[in-house]
């Protein structure tokens, strides 16, 4: 998937609906942060982005959303030996 195709709310909403994911406000906000560019990131890095953008989203919601996006194929994971899991938007 080319994340650059999903750089606005309407495209992201379509992407979520296409994967049978209810596009809640929090999921859309998280998806906008994730799919704005091709990137690799950890959950902790995403949580920092959420905080930096002053979004009212809990850590639990971030982790649950990452698991949902992974299970539906929107994200791939890269497990490293040092117990970090990186998420990939490609």
Q: Over which residues does each language-model region extend?
A:
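Basic amphipathic alpha-helical segments that dock to polyanions
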Residues: 62-72
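A short acidic, leucine-rich amphipathic alpha-helix
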Residues: 45-51
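Non-DNA-binding regulatory cores of transcription-related proteins
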Residues: 71-90
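Short, Lys/Arg-enriched N-terminal segment that forms or immediately precedes the first helix
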Residues: 6-20
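Long C-terminal interaction/binding lobes of large macromolecular proteins
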Residues: 34-35, 48
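Pre-recognition alpha-helix immediately N-terminal to the DNA-recognition helix
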Residues: 28-33
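Short capping segments at the starts of secondary-structure elements
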Residues: 23, 36-42
């Amino acid at each position: 998937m080319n994340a650059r195709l999903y750089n606005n709310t309407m495209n992201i909403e379509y992407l979520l609906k296409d994967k049978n994911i209810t596009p809640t406000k929090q999921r859309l906000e998280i998806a906008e942060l994730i799919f704005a560019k091709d990137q690799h990131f950890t959950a902790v890095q995403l949580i920092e982005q959420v905080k930096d953008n002053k979004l009212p989203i809990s850590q639990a919601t971030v982790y649950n959303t990452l698991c949902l996006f992974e299970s539906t194929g929107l994200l791939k994971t890269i497990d490293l030996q040092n117990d970090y899991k990186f998420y990939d938007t490609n």
